[in-house]
UniProtKB/Swiss-Prot annotation:
InterPro entries: Enolpyruvate_Tfrase_dom (IPR001986), Enolpyruvate_Tfrase_sf (IPR036968), EPSP_synthase (IPR006264), EPSP_synthase_CS (IPR023193), RNA3'P_cycl/enolpyr_Trfase_a/b (IPR013792). Pathway: Metabolic intermediate biosynthesis; chorismate biosynthesis; chorismate from D-erythrose 4-phosphate and phosphoenolpyruvate: step 6/7. Pfam families: EPSP_synthase (PF00275). Belongs to the EPSP synthase family. HAMAP family: EPSP_synth. This is 3-phosphoshikimate 1-carboxyvinyltransferase. The gene is aroA. Coiled coil: none annotated. 3-phosphoshikimate binds at residues 23-24, 28, 170-172, 198, 314, 338, 342. Its main location: cytoplasm. PANTHER family: AROM/DEHYDROQUINATE SYNTHASE (PTHR21090), PENTAFUNCTIONAL AROM POLYPEPTIDE (PTHR21090:SF5). Phosphoenolpyruvate binds at residues 23, 97, 125, 172, 346, 388, 413. It comes from Pectobacterium atrosepticum (strain SCRI 1043 / ATCC BAA-672) (Erwinia carotovora subsp. atroseptica). It is found in: Cytoplasm.
Length: 429
């Protein structure tokens, strides 16, 4: 019997939420700290499945660290260079793309025999473009099951040099190459083929590499230049920003139902592109206020929009369920093909579940159109082992209709106590 959670209609949502640390920033910070010279103290680290997979892998690779009892402060003793794997290793990375992709690249600096594997869904998430790029730099990589997908066997060999990579599927491939390149024997020049998706996630990578002592030059995000034979240096203390994607559910809830919700841990100068989600809510009609360390949102009459969402693919999912509350017709979210290669095929899943609550949905190859019904229907929402599906569809309870979320614990990937926090800020009808 699958676990489920029924959310009863919410009359009002109000209060302040201190955001858990960003998944994207947490796993990048752990890897950079592990490769650095010196000791790094990471604060506001996210405690979630993806981060635990990264920590487990680092332990297997000989990295020493100390984690606080609440798992949000981590002191890491850096290796001062690439990992050394003296004996064959197999690392199980669950469904953590933010661990699989960067480690696949970083471990190609090390001669050895390392297998990277994960859950069945991980074996359906493409990694061929990254493997092709690493091979151009001299890496020796074998596919153990299906061509272009994990599991992978790595034998080192990455030297750098001239590399081209397809940017149209996932920005994590470029992130993985960028973070590895400074430790390569040669300088690396990376040319991007196709349109680079999720560009703001590359900005996170560049910003964090700089914090750890490495500068990267680029020409308008089309060519990147990284000097080889460098060393990452610990910044000493590094604060992990709150997760801007996690903020999206609470900001949207305020926009739909009000009161006023303030999320802290991100603000106007955040390194994460997903803070731009608040601009989309504002465009729909919500009232948004920005501080250095917070974003605040309150209800406005929401209107349908038609927008390119390539810059905020994760947070854009929240707009798909917010669209159920928009006046004036059909909301169209465009340029979101990369939803299809995430934790599940999010475009297909979103279309199926939106129809269950009564919406009219057109699902295109890289877009979705959503026309809300006059009244939402009560439904059981499948979550596809995808944390964002569970959190997005919790917003249905902001109507006068209850909603049942199947497998609510799947939020553990990024936000283990999401439903407790939602309940804390909610006043039931």
């Amino acid at each position: 019997m699958q676990e489920s959670l029924t959310l009863h209609p919410i009359k009002l949502i109000n209060g302040t939420l201190n955001l858990p640390g960003s998944k994207s920033v947490s796993n990048r910070a752990l890897l950079l700290a592990a490769l650095s010279e010196g000791k790094t103290r990471l604060t506001n680290l996210l405690d979630s499945d993806d981060v635990r997979h990264m920590l487990t892998a680092l332990t297997a690779l000989g990295v020493e660290y100390h984690l606080s009892s609440d798992r949000t402060v981590c002191e890491i003793i850096g290796l001062g260079g690439a990992f050394a794997a003296s004996q064959p290793l197999e690392l199980f990375l669950g469904n953590a793309g933010t661990a699989m992709r960067p480690l696949a690249a970083a471990l190609c600096l090390t001669d050895g025999d390392i297998v990277l594997t994960g859950e069945p869904r991980m074996k359906e998430r493409p990694i061929g473009h990254l493997v092709d790029a690493l091979r151009q730099g001299g890496a020796k990589i074998d596919y153990l099951e299906q061509e272009n997908y994990p599991p992978l066997r790595l034998h080192g060999g990455f030297q750098g040099g001239e590399i081209s990579v397809d940017g149209s599927v996932s920005s994590q491939f470029l992130t993985a190459l960028l973070m590895t390149a400074p430790l390569a024997a040669q300088d690396t020049q990376i040319s991007i083929q196709g349109d680079l998706v999720s560009k703001p996630y590359i900005d996170i990578t560049l910003h964090m590499m700089k914090a750890f002592g490495i500068d990267v030059r680029h020409e308008n995000y089309q060519r990147f230049f990284v000097a080889g034979r460098q060393q990452y240096r610990s910044p000493g203390d590094y604060l992990v920003e709150g997760d801007a994607s996690s903020a999206s559910y609470f900001l949207a809830a305020a926009a739909i139902k009000g009161g006023v919700v303030r999320v802290t841990g991100v603000g106007r100068n955040s390194v994460q592109g997903d803070i731009r989600f608040a601009d989309v809510l504002e465009k729909m009609g919500a009232i948004v206020r920005w501080g250095e360390d917070y974003i605040e949102c309150e209800r406005g009459e929401l209107h349908a929009i038609d927008m390119d969402m390539n810059h905020i693919p994760d947070a854009a999912m929240t707009i798909a369920t917010a669209a159920l509350f928009a006046q004036g017709g059909t909301t169209t979210l465009r340029n979101i093909y990369n939803w299809r290669v995430k934790e599940t095929d999010r475009l297909a899943a979103m279309a199926i579940e939106l129809r269950k609550v009564g919406a009219e949905v057109e699902e295109g190859n890289d877009y979705i159109r959503i026309t809300p019904p006059a009244k939402l229907k009560a439904a059981e929402i499948g979550t596809y082992n995808d944390h964002r599906m569970a959190m997005c569809f919790s917003l249905v309870a902001l109507s006068d209709t209850p909603v049942t979320i199947l497998d609510p614990k799947c939020t553990a990937k990024t936000f283990p106590d999401y439903f407790e926090q939602l309940a804390r800020l909610s006043e039931l009808a």
